[in-house]
Amino acid sequence: MKNLSILLLSAFLFLLPLKFASAEKVHGIAMHGTPKYSNNFTHLDYVNPNAPKGGTVKFGSYGSFDNLNRVAFKGSKAAGLGYVNDTLMRRVWDEAFSLYGLIAEKVELPEDRSSITFYLNSNATFHDGSPITRDDVLFSLETFQTKGTPNQKKTYGKVIKTELLGNDGIKMIFENNEDKELPLIIAGFLPIIPKKFYEDLDVTKTFLDIPLGSGPYQVDSLDPGRQIKYKRVEDYWAKDLPVNKGLYNFDTIIYDYYKDSNVLVEAFKVGEYDFRREYNVKRWLSEYDFKAVQNGEVILTEMNNDRPVGMNGLVMNTRRCLLYTSPSPRDIPLSRMPSSA
């Protein structure tokens, strides 16, 4: 009887790690806790699922662009390219950090976050109608691991092994489970690019060819460095997914570029583009009482920023001491003044 008890205890201890290492297929994942939306949600709370579609919206951008290549580190990428390529999952904006199925219909994330497994949506297609396959996902991962930006190489390089599971699963195994955000970053930020379009290109170089994508918009036309125009994909494969309903309603999105920041502001004042975020407090307080504001054509809104923000300040690159608090510099003997070495 004693031997039987020992045998049963051994079997339990053997199966215990398997239990905690296993995971179930789910529709969404969260950085902390569980996602807000259940697996049968129909749309996000902050959208109108029946919003009308049509019209054009114009944005103003500062600078220029010379690149439509999502991979190349060189050059300046055009604004709006994120609309062209879908990711495996979609991040939502009424939760701190949660993602829901997009190209990946379901996902498995073990409790220890040592890996993540994506199960692709069989309806996912590129704009030419060709299916998005696991080969495209693997190609995207490997391309950004080896030829992306330094940050992308570092992040995606933490995937040390991949496995194909069944007909639609792809498992990514990490070098360790120390980075708890890594599974969510891969799910929500890795652009899935078509292998057939990129495999014969030198992806380290810039290009201005219209890229093949899978997202809600595709490039319609461009004037390099001056303007890029996107058109809504009417037969977008994911338009009816709960995570997308009520979004991407404009038929056309245009980004106009301005090489002078003051001209960019003045262009908004006379209606050359439709929306602007103002980060300059002085300008906000002194320059936003123009005619279009007075007659109600432009609506000003102040929004609280509840997120952590970076430091603003001046950093002096010098070896000289810039300021003495006590005693006064004029009271310090020359022999004690800092050298310029």
Pin down the residues of each PLM region.
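Bacterial N-terminal signal peptides
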Residues: 8-16
